[in-house]
């Protein structure tokens, strides 16, 4: 007892080490060289999953060598062969059909737990040299294998396994266009018919006394489709697309029928047109009448109200038309004459501020 107390290292050399594993208390090998002990203990603590604490199948060393004989005869050493293509395909199918199997827990690391052939020990090469476990491509940062070493299914298989709602819908544009075309073959007019209708529509619209804005407003009030004056103008000029021309033709045709049936009697179209006319129609003056007005303008650029009334009566024009003509003529004279070359009879026009607001109505 005294000898044992005086030499505490003899206990380590005479007794064997005991490892506390999950399988039970196992007797270890006697104390050896510290360098060899570190290598063997490290290999004992690194199974196929790379976790240093999960050694379930590695037993104690039986001799004093750096590599254990039990490790050489272990199931992993016997399976030190790369899996074949059939095994990989089988593993991919198993992973594709049962994704939850791939995410196994650390307690099922035994090679025989898988249906496919077990993978070789990643920490030992064929020559018996240790490798860095954490540098292997099959390991993650935590040391666990991704999906049990099985490769993910290809992109084509994953696309086919999607729900029909999640898949990319097919292009129905061509199908829809063919369907619409087959459905409206009988009603679709030709380009010649559209051109002829546009000419007839313009002539009849002018004959009835409606403007393009009146037609657009009437279509919006009667049929619920509001069109601007620009749209009607482009239709008459054949500047719309063929599809839009086909859509607008039946509406304009209905408007023409309604306008023709209501000719000579005030109807809703006349009321709508009257509401849409926010300004008066442009008056066209004949050349002879313009000559008389021009002669009177040279004599008196700004006639009085009585002169405008008498001149309108002599020319059989409205008083407002004559007044607007003189107003526009004075504005035109200002634009044509430079500021330094004004005539004496136009000097007084700068003092009149009411004339500057005159416009052609």
UniProtKB/Swiss-Prot annotation:
Positions of the DNA-binding region: 278-337
PANTHER family: POU DOMAIN, POU DOMAIN, CLASS 3, TRANSCRIPTION FACTOR 4
Organism: Homo sapiens (Human)
Keyword Phosphoprotein applies: yes
Subunit structure comment from the entry: Interacts with HNRNPU.
Compositional bias segments (type: Basic and acidic residues): 165-183
Record has Zinc as a keyword: no
Disease with which this protein is associated in UniProt: Deafness, X-linked, 2: A form of deafness characterized by both conductive hearing loss resulting from stapes (perilymphatic gusher) fixation, and progressive sensorineural deafness.
Subcellular location: Nucleus
Alphabetic keyword roster: Deafness, Disease variant, DNA-binding, Homeobox, Non-syndromic deafness, Nucleus, Phosphoprotein, Transcription, Transcription regulation
Effect the entry attributes to changing residue 323 to G: In DFNX2; somatic mosaicism in 50% of the peripheral blood lymphocytes
InterPro entries: HD, Homeobox_CS, Homeodomain-like_sf, Lambda_DNA-bd_dom_sf, POU, POU_dom, POU_domain_TF, TF_POU_3
Residue numbers spanned by region Disordered: 99-131, 144-192
Name of one Pfam family that matches: Homeodomain
Name of this chain's protein: POU domain, class 3, transcription factor 4
Modified residues (Phosphoserine): 265
Superkingdom in the source lineage: Eukaryota
